[in-house]
Amino acid sequence: MSETAPAAPAAPAPAEKTPVKKKARKSAGAAKRKASGPPVSELITKAVAASKERSGVSLAALKKALAAAGYDVEKNNSRIKLGLKSLVSKGTLVQTKGTGASGSFKLNKKAAAGEAKPKPKKAGAAKPKKPAGAAKKPKKATGAATPKKGAKKTPKKAKKPAAAAGAKKAKSPKKAKAAKPKKAPKSPAKAKAVKPKAAKPKAAKPKTAKPKKAPAKKK
C-alpha cells in the first residue's frame, strides 16, 4: 500500500504541464503575426496622403503603392477593400468617384486636422498631477484638528465662571448680614418719634376749660 500511494499523484503532473506549453506557443505565434507589419488602414492612409492627384487615388493606383511598400496585394485584396470602406465610414478618406471599394479616394483634410489636434491633448494628459493637489487637501484636515485644541480650552473658560459664581455667592451673604443690623436700629427711632406726637392731645384739654370761666364774669 505504501508503494502505490506516491505513484498516483505523480501521474497527473505531466498532463498539467502540456497545456501550458501549448498556450505559450500560441501566444508567441500571435505576437509574430502582429509584429509582421502595420495594419492595412495605416498603409492605405499613407499611400493616399503621399499621392499628389487632386481628383484622388484610384483603387488600381492604391494597390500599386501598397505593392511597392512590400504589401502582398493579391492575398490581402479583400482586406484592402474592407480597409477602404472602414476609412470612408470613419471620415478619414473621402470617396470622390465610384461606389464601395471601387473608385478614387482622397484624404479628408478635416479628419487629418482632427487627428493632429489630439496630440496636444496628450500633453494635457499630464494633468493627472492634480491628484498631488488632492494630497494637499489632507493638510486642511490637520487644520481641522485645531478646533480640537479650542475645544480643550473651552472647559477652562467654563470653570472660571463657576468659580466666579462661587465667589459671588460667598459675597452675597455678607451683604445680607450688613443690611439686617442697619434696619434694626431705625425701627426704635421711629417708635420714639411717635410717642411725643401722642402727647399733644393732652395740651388740648385745657382749652376746653375756658368756657367755664365765662359764666363767672356774668355774675
Curated annotation (Swiss-Prot):
Any one GO molecular-function label of the UniProt entry: structural constituent of chromatin
Residues recorded as bearing N-acetylserine in the entry: S2
GO cellular component: nucleosome; nucleus
Residues modified to Citrulline: R54
CDD domains documented for this protein: H15 (cd00073)
UniProt xrefs under InterPro entries: H1/H5 (IPR005819), Histone_H1/H5_H15 (IPR005818), WH-like_DNA-bd_sf (IPR036388), WH_DNA-bd_sf (IPR036390)
Residue positions where N6-(beta-hydroxybutyryl)lysine is found in the record: K34, K52, K64, K85, K90, K106
Modification after translation (UniProt): H1 histones are progressively phosphorylated during the cell cycle, becoming maximally phosphorylated during late G2 phase and M phase, and being dephosphorylated sharply thereafter. Acetylated at Lys-26. Deacetylated at Lys-26 by SIRT1.
Chief localisation class: nucleus
Residues with PTM Phosphothreonine: T18, T146
Keywords: Acetylation, Chromosome, Citrullination, DNA-binding, Hydroxylation, Methylation, Nucleus, Phosphoprotein
Residues covered by region (Disordered): 1-41, 91-219
Modified-residue entries (N6-methyllysine), positions: K26
Superkingdom, taxonomy of origin: Eukaryota
GO annotation, biological process: nucleosome assembly
A Pfam family hit: Linker_histone
Residues bearing the modification N6-acetyllysine: K17, K26
Subcellular location: Nucleus; Chromosome
Phosphoserine carried by residues: S2, S36, S187
Compositionally biased tracts (Low complexity): 1-15
Modification N6-succinyllysine, positions: K34
Biased composition (Basic residues): 20-35, 119-140, 149-160, 168-185, 192-219
Stated role: Histone H1 protein binds to linker DNA between nucleosomes forming the macromolecular structure known as the chromatin fiber. Histones H1 are necessary for the condensation of nucleosome chains into higher-order structured fibers. Also acts as a regulator of individual gene transcription through chromatin remodeling, nucleosome spacing and DNA methylation.
Recorded domain comment: The C-terminal domain is required for high-affinity binding to chromatin.
Family the entry assigns: Belongs to the histone H1/H5 family.
Protein name, UniProt field: Histone H1.4
